[in-house]
Amino acid sequence: IAINELAPRVHNSGHYTIEACHCSQFENHVRAVLGWPLGNPQMVAPAAVMVNLLGTEKTSGQPRGLENALRLAGVRFHVYGKMMSGAGRKMGHITVLGNSVEAAQSIAECAAKEIYFG
């Protein structure tokens, strides 16, 4: 068994649950901590794709290119509010729901190409 990471918190790989599931990882985390029953984690769409938005250089954390990205059907944008960007730094993410992974992936990739920080 190989273990990559243990994270006793919500994790970036589950951010898609904000839009894609009846109950997000964030809500279920709070429910678990409070001893409440967990919510329904089932997806609300047949497919979902989440793409991290990474910085490319040390510059302002201000997102740019949103106008074109948000014109694409179903794109949900999340910015993490970091003041400065850096190469490989996670600055936000986008999520796209769709009828297939391929369709959602295509839209998500197009949207991600439009967004940059600076």
Model region roles, listed by residue range:
Residues 7-58:
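Active-site "cap" helix and flanking loop/linker of ATP-utilizing ligase/carboxylase catalytic domains
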Residues 22-26, 69-73, 96-99, 113-117:
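Short, low-complexity, polar/charged sequence segments that are solvent-exposed and flexible
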Residues 27, 51, 64, 75, ...:
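A generic structural signal for well-ordered alpha-helical surface patches
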Residues 79-118:
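Generic C-terminus detector
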Residues 13-15, 60, 86, 103:
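Intrinsically disordered, low-complexity acidic/polar segments
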Residues 44-45, 51-85:
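Glycine-rich active-site loop/lid that clamps phosphate-bearing ligands
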Residues 1-5:
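Protein kinase-like catalytic core scaffold
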